[in-house]
Every structure is written in structure tokens, then in C-alpha cells.
């Protein structure tokens, strides 16, 4: 019996060692409590901290990279402008100094009118390239035509409506003159010429043009001294009216022209019928046509809310006032754009040999990068470091197209 007791104790210890490791010493009740704690229900939670979950990736990694590209582009623009203007640093000219210097400068409005400054104007979706083949329109002559019946009362006035093609309406008008032929007078006389803008008659309109139906809006009035017994061609500046017509083509219903002498005789030749050949009123325009033609943009264009991950062109407006660069007179801001996105093999690659090199040695060559493949200049009017006003053209400041290279 003495030998049997140690032997029995050994068997009991061996049985304890052979039990499953996950089973607690207290039996099934303890195992159930441990399972409940692991599931997070019932009982007291374990004081041991749970292992932290790995951080989730950013919700929009493309957006983070895009913001990084924007910041790099802005810094690059700053350095490029200073470098291309041969300035070591931005001129120290405050807004107050600019206000003091501008009135003493030569008239700047002529420069601002003659040269295009890219500002808040919207840029076309398709990029533009220089067109060296098509002719540039310089002078446009528009002959008077019959007015629309909607502006006539008892068939009057028949003259004058001027039609302009969309091509002309998108040019820069440098000068606009309305030419009217005045009949000869037997003796020197003072003639009062007036130009009235026409508009359709309303429901309350009457033949007298009173009330809500009035169709005459005086836009020009001239006093002319005639001394010749022969006819006289009179020119009238019409640039301002033309600008309003081009901005709102639906407002161009035509004009009525009158030139009365002291006796009340209308000397203006406005008849479009026989006997007035070559004497009809006409409009002469001096325009500066944009010598660029639209071409299909082969690159992708995206906005800031796009989920596109491929190489794409994004809008970016550079605000010089936000930089504190008051030394730039014009433009105060411009649309620079920037490129961002991934470049997979054979996606929008600029050069075919790039793909061949990467295929031949994929490990030894860097992948293609999303970069500008077409850029255009901007015009700039600015103060240099000597407080002189300079006009210049800065190349390569607007991204027109992006691609992989």
C-alpha cells in the first residue's frame, strides 16, 4: 500500500499535464467565463490591453498626392517667374508704393487694351496652338441690312441692322466706326445727327412708340457743320456699342439713323432700295484675331473632385496678391494648372521609345512620370527692382496638356 500511493499520485499528475492547454484548472465554468470575456459580453473585461489594430490607409491617398503636387507647382511658379524675369528676389514694392507710382507712369490703359492679360477669364477645354497658315483678319466691313419686322411700325424703319459672324464676335475689337452718307446741302448748314437703338415693340406699343412700346433708345447725338455742296461721309465711333452687342448678341436689333437740317429734312441716306447703291451705311471694324486654332486635347482634364488616379491636368489659379506680390500690376491672377496622377506603362506616353526601354529593362529604368507636355506663355506688366514698369511675356507658365514621359 505504501508503494501504491506514490504510483497513484504520479498517474494523477500525468493526467493533469495531458489536459488541453486552453482548459482552465477550475473546469468548464472558468472556460465559459474566459470565452465570454474574449467576445466582450458578460463578466469583467480582461485588464490586459488588446493589441492595437493596424492603422487604416488614408481615405483618399490620391487627394494627398494631388495636394502635394499643387504645393510643388506653386513653389515652382514663384521661382520660375523670378528666374525668367532675371530677378534675384521679389522687388520690395508695397501696395501703397504701387498706388503712388502708377499715377506718375505713362497711360497704362493703352497697354492693357492692346495686350491680353490672362486673368479670371475661363480657358477653353481644348488647348490652342499657333496657326501659321490661316490668315489673320484685320479689317471687317459689315453692310447695313433690313431690320427685323419686330422692331418696325408700319414698315419703318427699314434700316439698319448689322450682322456679325461668330468668328468676328470672338476677336478683339481695336476700332469700330459707323459710316453714314449725308446728302449735299445748297448752303452751309448745321446738321443734328442722332442714332437710336431699336428694340422690339411690347404689347402696349403704339405707332407713336409711346408708353411701354417705345422702341427708340438714343445712344449717340452729334452736331455737324456742313459746308460742302457735295455729299459727305460721316464717321461715328461705335466701339462701345459694339462691345455691348458682342457681349449680348440678343440685344442687337439694329439702329435708326437720322440727320436733320434746320428745315427738318433728313439728310442721312438709309434707303436700301435703288438709287442709293454704294451709299448705304456700313460698319468698319479693326480687329485683332486670335492667331491660334483649337486642336483636340489628347490629355485628360480633371477637376479637384475627380477620383481619377491616372495622369491628368488639374485646375490651379495662381493669385499674386495672396503671395504678397504687389509689384505685379497685371494679371493679378492667372490659371496655371498642374499635372498629377499615376503613369502605367503605355498610358499616354509621349515618346514610343520610352515604352521599349522599360520593356527591355524594367528593373533598370524608372517608370514614366506625369509631367506637362504642352505649355503656353502669359503676358505680364510689372515693376522691376528699380521701380520701372516693364511689359514682358513669360514662356511656359500655363500647363495646357499633361502626359507620361
UniProtKB/Swiss-Prot annotation:
Gene3D superfamilies: 2.60.120.970, Cystine-knot cytokines (2.10.90.10)
Tissue spec. comment: Highly expressed in the developing limb bud, initially detected in the distal mesenchyme, and later localizing to regions around the developing bones. Is also expressed in adult dental pulp and brain.
Highest taxon above the source species: Eukaryota
Entries under InterPro entries matching the protein: Cystine-knot_cytokine, TGF-b_C, TGF-b_propeptide, TGF-beta-rel, TGFb_CS
Organism: Mus musculus
Record bears the keyword Glycosyltransferase: no
Protein's UniProt name: Growth/differentiation factor 11
Gene coding for it: Gdf11
Subunit structure: Homodimer; disulfide-linked. Interacts directly with ACVR2B. Interacts directly with ACVR2A. Interacts with ACVR1B, TGFBR1 and ACVR1C in an ACVR2B-dependent manner. Interacts with FST isoform 2/FS288.
Segments passing through the bilayer: none
Predominant location category: secreted
Amino acid at each position: 500500500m505504501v508503494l501504491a500511493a506514490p504510483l497513484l499520485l504520479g498517474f494523477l499528475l500525468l493526467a493533469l499535464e495531458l489536459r488541453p492547454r486552453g482548459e482552465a484548472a477550475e473546469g468548464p465554468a472558468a472556460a465559459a467565463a474566459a470565452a465570454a470575456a474574449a467576445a466582450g459580453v458578460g463578466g469583467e473585461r480582461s485588464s490586459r490591453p488588446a493589441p492595437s489594430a493596424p492603422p487604416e490607409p488614408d481615405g483618399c491617398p490620391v487627394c494627398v498626392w494631388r495636394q502635394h503636387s499643387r504645393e510643388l507647382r506653386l513653389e515652382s511658379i514663384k521661382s520660375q517667374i523670378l528666374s525668367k524675369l532675371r530677378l534675384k528676389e521679389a522687388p520690395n514694392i508695397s501696395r501703397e508704393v504701387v498706388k503712388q507710382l502708377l499715377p506718375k507712369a505713362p497711360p497704362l490703359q493703352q497697354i492693357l487694351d492692346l495686350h491680353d492679360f490672362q486673368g479670371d477669364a475661363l480657358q477653353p477645354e481644348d488647348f490652342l496652338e499657333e496657326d501659321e497658315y490661316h490668315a489673320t483678319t484685320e479689317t471687317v466691313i459689315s453692310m447695313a441690312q433690313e431690320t427685323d419686322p419686330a422692331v418696325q411700325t408700319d414698315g419703318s424703319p427699314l434700316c439698319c441692322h448689322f450682322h456679325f459672324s461668330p468668328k468676328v464676335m470672338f476677336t478683339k475689337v481695336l476700332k469700330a466706326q459707323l459710316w453714314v452718307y449725308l446728302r449735299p446741302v445748297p448752303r452751309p448748314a448745321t446738321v443734328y445727327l442722332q442714332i437710336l437703338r431699336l428694340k422690339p415693340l411690347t404689347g402696349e406699343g403704339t405707332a407713336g412708340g409711346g408708353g411701354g412700346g417705345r422702341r427708340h433708345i438714343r445712344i449717340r447725338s452729334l452736331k455737324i457743320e456742313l459746308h460742302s455742296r457735295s455729299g459727305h461721309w460721316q464717321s461715328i465711333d461705335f466701339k462701345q456699342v459694339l462691345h455691348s452687342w458682342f457681349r449680348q448678341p440678343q440685344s442687337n436689333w439694329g439702329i435708326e439713323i437720322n440727320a436733320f437740317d434746320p428745315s427738318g429734312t433728313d439728310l442721312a441716306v438709309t434707303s436700301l432700295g435703288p438709287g442709293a447703291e454704294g451709299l448705304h451705311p456700313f460698319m468698319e471694324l479693326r480687329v485683332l484675331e486670335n492667331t491660334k486654332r483649337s486642336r483636340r486635347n489628347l490629355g485628360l482634364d480633371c477637376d479637384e473632385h475627380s477620383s481619377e488616379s491616372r495622369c491628368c491636368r488639374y485646375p490651379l489659379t495662381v493669385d499674386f496678391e495672396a503671395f504678397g506680390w504687389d509689384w505685379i500690376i497685371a494679371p493679378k491672377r492667372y490659371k496655371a494648372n498642374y499635372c498629377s496622377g499615376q503613369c502605367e506603362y503605355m498610358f499616354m506616353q509621349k515618346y514610343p521609345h520610352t515604352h521599349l526601354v522599360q520593356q527591355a529593362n524594367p528593373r533598370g529604368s524608372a517608370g514614366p512620370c506625369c509631367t506637362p507636355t504642352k505649355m503656353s506663355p502669359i503676358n505680364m506688366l510689372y515693376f522691376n527692382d528699380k521701380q520701372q514698369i516693364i511689359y514682358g511675356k513669360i514662356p511656359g507658365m500655363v500647363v495646357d496638356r499633361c502626359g507620361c514621359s
